């Protein structure tokens, strides 16, 4: 059983049962949560806010389905991180080579000036 979070324009949210998805982890988690809620509070105290929350969500502003898993979600981010990493390595190598050549040129000029004296 899947669940959907709906967030309205005021920032309030509620859990909505989604009968099209069957996720045993979510079902077990929800069952234990409900069992804990019923064990600690009365049935009416739990059911009343839950029913009231469902009636307030006619037009959700953001709807996030927690059971949809897409393998390509993080692929673009990973490729961008790899590209930036390679770019930084290239820039570091170019800077190192430039500093090395500059120091080598300065040392050579210094030794040549000492030899001329």
Swiss-Prot record:
Subcellular location(s): the record lists:
Host membrane; Virion
Has the keyword DNA-binding been applied to this entry? no
Major localisation:
host cell
Q: Which keywords are on file for this protein?
A: Glycoprotein, Host membrane, Membrane, Transmembrane, Transmembrane helix, Virion
**Domain of life of the native organism:** Viruses
Record keyword Acetylation present: no
GO CC annotations, alphabetized: host cell membrane; membrane; virion component
Q: How does it sit in the membrane?
A: Single-pass membrane protein
Sites of glycosylation? 29, 65
Give me the segments passing through the membrane.
71-91
Which family, according to UniProt? Answer: Belongs to the asfivirus B117L family.
Designated name of the protein: Uncharacterized protein B117L
Tell me the classification of the organism that encodes this protein.
Viruses, Varidnaviria, Bamfordvirae, Nucleocytoviricota, Pokkesviricetes
């Amino acid at each position: 059983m899947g669940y959907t979070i709906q967030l309205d324009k005021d920032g309030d949210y509620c859990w909505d049962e989604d009968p099209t998805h069957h996720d045993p982890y979510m079902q077990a988690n929800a069952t234990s949560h409900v069992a804990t809620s019923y064990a600690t509070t009365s049935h009416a105290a739990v059911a009343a806010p839950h029913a009231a929350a469902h009636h307030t969500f006619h037009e959700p502003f953001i709807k996030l389905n927690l059971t949809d898993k897409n393998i390509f979600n993080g692929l673009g981010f990973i490729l961008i991180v790899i590209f930036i990493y390679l770019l930084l390595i290239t820039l570091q190598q170019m800077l190192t080579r430039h500093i090395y050549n500059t120091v080598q040129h300065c040392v050579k000029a210094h030794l040549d000036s000492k030899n001329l004296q």
